[in-house]
Amino acid sequence: MTSAIEEEREILESIYPEEFKCINDSTFEITQPIDREESNCDNPPSLIFTCQLSEAYPDEVPDVKITFSEPHPWLGEEEIERLKQVVAQNAEECLGMAMIFSLCSVAKEETNAILIEQSQRETQAIEERHRKEAEQENKKFHGTPVTVESFTEWKKGFDAWRNEQLKLEQESKLKEALSAASSSNARKAILEKRMTGRELFENNLVKLDDVEGEA
């Protein structure tokens, strides 16, 4: 262990008395709990920062590994890669000086930022879902807005229904007239000319007694 690494170890042990763990002479592990309020996350996992220092440290960037104490849906491979890039950039800026504390701090801050972003996305998704549900409920009370196209389609259906009703009414009246007709000639005239009740009486094809009998 070089003097620079030994000095780094002493610094880390004083800053992280419970979180620091020395894997070997050149490999350190620091477990940092993530605060619920700072991250806006109900059950955030702890950030595990592992670094391996070469004999050239601090003039050479350490090999860093970032993991978490347990899986979390907001902290996948994409987010871990983002953390590694931020740490690597900070390490380049700190070359020539003790940097592990700085790298750990940057990793924790970026983890909080990621969790806050994910929390905001989830909140927006929930609000959007509630908004759409509210719109669907409002449609039940306000109905569908009428357009030229929708009215034309409705009118077409209504006209077809109305024509069918008129046809049924005419057929019903025809059956009644046939039943009231006094002779086969009268029934024939009804079928050929579709005569009305008034015309049947005027032409003496239906007797008043027949109609009253039907009633």
UniProtKB/Swiss-Prot annotation:
Assigned GO CC terms: cytosol; nucleus
Organism: Schizosaccharomyces pombe (strain 972 / ATCC 24843)
SUPFAM superfamilies, alphabetized: UBC-like (SSF54495)
Ranges of residues in domain RWD: 7-114
Keywords, alphabetical: Cytoplasm, Nucleus
Subcellular location: Cytoplasm; Nucleus
UniProt KW tRNA-binding keyword: no
Protein name per the record: RWD domain-containing protein C1393.09c
Record PANTHER family: RWD DOMAIN-CONTAINING PROTEIN
Top-rank taxon: Eukaryota
Single GO BP term: cytoplasmic translation
